[in-house]
Amino acid sequence: MMGGRGTGGKWPSAFGLLLLWGVAASALPLESGPTGQDSVQEATEGRSGLLTFLAWWHEWASQASSSTPVGGGTPGLSKSQERPPPQQPPHLDKKPCKNFFWKTFSSCK
C-alpha cells in the first residue's frame, strides 16, 4: 500500500510545525509607533484568527485520521487483501527472435 504507515506520522508532525510557527509568530515583539495600540489590536485579532484556524485544522485532521485507520486500532483486511494474488502461469524461456525489428511490432514465430 502506498500511503501505509509513513503517512500516519506526517499529519501530526505537520500540525506540530504549524503550531510552533504560530507560537513563534505570536511571540515576536510588536512594532511600536504612533499607532501602537492599533497594532496590538491587530495582532490580537490575528492570533485569534490563527488559533481558530489551528483548532479547525486539528479537528479536521483528527476526523480524517479517525475515519481511516492508518496503523492503529483493530487490524482489518480489505477485500483486496483477503483474497490470494492471482496465479500466473510459469514463465517459459523463449529464445529471442533473430530478425525482430521493433518498428514493425511483428511477433516472432
UniProtKB/Swiss-Prot annotation:
One of its GO terms (biological process) is adenylate cyclase-inhibiting G protein-coupled receptor signaling pathway. Disulfide bonds join C97-C108. Induction: Not induced by kainate. Residues 64-97 are annotated as: Disordered. It is found in: Secreted. Expressed in a subset of GABAergic cells in the cortex and hippocampus. Pfam families: Somatostatin. Residues 26-93 form a propeptide. Residues 1-25 form the signal peptide. InterPro entries: Somatostatin (IPR004250), Somatostatin/Cortistatin_C (IPR018142). Keywords: Cleavage on pair of basic residues, Disulfide bond, Hormone, Secreted, Signal. It comes from the Eukaryota. One of its GO terms (molecular function) is G protein-coupled receptor binding. Its main location: secreted. PANTHER family: CORTISTATIN, SOMATOSTATIN. This is Cortistatin. It comes from Mus musculus. The lineage of its organism: Eukaryota, Metazoa, Chordata, Craniata, Vertebrata.
